[in-house]
């Protein structure tokens, strides 16, 4: 596992291809918003090259708390931009799964399947509402 004290120290690891960086945007559901709407990520979230059983665990969550901590939205229109860092994927990986809780259909999880690496590498944030 890569150990650092600050987000800036990760830049070297990113430049050297030692990390997979995934950007996200999340916001409350405007229709169902209530005061106290919160978000976090489960520390066991992982990425996996499609077609494998290899699980690469979270190295760092930037700008989003890891459970049990929570970020509380200030209003229904607020957006939270955050970044998750994982170990580098094997060369030649074309699609990944991002899995917060395997096999769960629970609302609010960050489960994305068959995400093209071209989308991840473009820096365009993945969105979950």
Where are these regions (language model features)?
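Short, solvent-exposed beta-strand/turn "edge" segments of beta-rich domains on protein surfaces
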Residues: 9-20, 70-76
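Short, solvent-exposed, Trp/other aromatic-anchored flexible loops in extracytoplasmic proteins
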Residues: 59-97, 103
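Internal interaction segment
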Residues: 102-129
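Primarily extracytoplasmic ectodomains and periplasmic/lumenal surface modules that are beta-strand-rich
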Residues: 28-34, 92
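Low-complexity, acidic Ser/Thr/Pro/Gly-rich terminal tails and inter-domain linkers that flank the onset
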Residues: 1-17, 52-65
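A short, structured loop/turn motif at beta-sheet edges
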Residues: 16, 49-54, 87-94
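Short, well-ordered beta-strand segments enriched in hydrophobic/aromatic residues
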Residues: 18-30
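The feature marks short-to-medium sequence segments in extracytoplasmic or secretory-pathway proteins
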Residues: 34-71
């Amino acid at each position: 596992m890569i150990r650092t004290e600050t987000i800036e120290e990760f830049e070297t690891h990113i430049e050297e291809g030692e990390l997979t960086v995934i950007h996200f945007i999340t916001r409350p559901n405007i229709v169902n918003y209530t005061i106290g709407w919160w978000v976090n990520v489960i520390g066991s979230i992982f990425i996996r090259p499609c077609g494998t059983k290899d699980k690469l665990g979270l190295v760092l969550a930037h700008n989003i708390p890891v459970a049990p901590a929570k970020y509380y939205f200030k209003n229904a229109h607020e957006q939270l931009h955050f970044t998750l860092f994982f170990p580098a994927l094997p060369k030649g990986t074309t699609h990944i799964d991002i899995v917060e809780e395997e096999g769960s259909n629970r609302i609010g999880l960050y489960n994305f399947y068959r995400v093209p690496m071209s989308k991840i590498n473009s820096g365009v944030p993945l969105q979950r509402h």
